[in-house]
């Protein structure tokens, strides 16, 4: 039975048992994924007396600089995409391996965060790329289908953390099967941290670094462990596909 309170309690206990490793790994993951939100003061411009001619004159003044910056902006954007695909996504898989081993063995091995780079890196990159691509394409339809699909692929980085050799098609399909009937529960899990997110904003991200994000990642790991157990119970998967944390 899905028990969010139990997931959060266990996730918090595991996080506190390995406090500094959890904080360090969560911080690195947050930096790469942009998980930390810093509230900035709103700047208001008063434009009652704005002159259109002045705006046009300003545009023509800065246009040469904009033309110079455009290629740099394009390269920066492409570099950001490459960083996400080649570094952030595999790192997410490695950190999930760390969180799963921590909750399974009740000890933390920070060295596991590199697993996404050291074991079948190409398959990890491809599978995570396809996951992101499908979520993006579904989001083009409307926001809600994109959110639903994102929760459908919730388990993908955990599946890869457990078995990075699993074929990309099977990893994506298995995640959809594992989360069937639980997408609403996963949404509630994320929504239950809303109050913490608001408090994190008030502390300019400090609370997120030292408490909220490690707590959240620990809770998500427990949710995956539940989905994994149900998948075995329902015959959706087997030990060949998901061999557990005693391998690699």
Label the model's feature ranges:
Residues 1-248:
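Hydrophobic alpha-helical membrane segments
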């Amino acid at each position: 039975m899905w028990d969010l309170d139990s997931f959060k309690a266990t996730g918090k206990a595991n996080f506190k048992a390995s406090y500094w490793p959890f904080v360090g790994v969560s911080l690195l993951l947050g930096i790469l994924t942009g998980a930390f939100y810093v509230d900035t003061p709103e700047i208001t411009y008063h434009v009652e007396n704005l002159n259109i001619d002045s705006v046009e004159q300003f545009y023509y003044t800065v246009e040469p600089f904009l033309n110079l910056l455009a290629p740099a902006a394009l390269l920066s954007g492409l570099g950001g995409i490459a960083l996400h695909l080649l570094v952030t996504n595999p790192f997410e898989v490695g950190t999930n391996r760390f969180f799963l081993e921590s909750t399974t063995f009740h000890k933390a091995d920070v060295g596991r965060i590199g697993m996404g780079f050291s074991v079948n890196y190409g398959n990890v990159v491809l599978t995570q790329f396809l996951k992101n691509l499908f979520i993006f394409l579904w989001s083009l339809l409307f926001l809600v289908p994109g959110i639903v699909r994102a929760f459908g692929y919730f388990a993908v980085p955990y599946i890869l953390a457990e078995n990075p050799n699993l074929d990309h098609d099977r990893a994506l399909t298995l995640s959809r099967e594992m989360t069937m009937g639980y997408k609403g529960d996963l949404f509630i899990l994320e929504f239950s941290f809303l109050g913490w997110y608001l408090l994190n904003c008030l502390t300019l991200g400090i609370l997120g670094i030292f408490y909220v994000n490690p707590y959240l990642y620990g809770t998500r790991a427990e949710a995956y462990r539940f989905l994994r157990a149900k998948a075995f119970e329902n015959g959706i998967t087997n030990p060949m596909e998901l061999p557990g944390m005693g391998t690699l």
